[in-house]
Amino acid sequence: MSTSIRNRLPGTIEEIVSDKVVSEIVINTAAGPVTSIITTGSVKRMNLKKGDTAFAIIKATEVSVEAR
């Protein structure tokens, strides 16, 4: 995969919660868990499953912060 995005965190998919339109994916990385919302169609197209190795690719202008 070739991309200009520099913030790539390798990890393992811990959880996928899907509904009809969107899915929430949690990737465990060395920096901690990263949660992403993508379309359920993309999850199916990439054949993503719990336990798969994946990269969290983060564009600096697209980061949201949520207090816990």
Where are these regions (language model features)?
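Non-catalytic connector elements of ABC transporters
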Residues: 1-68
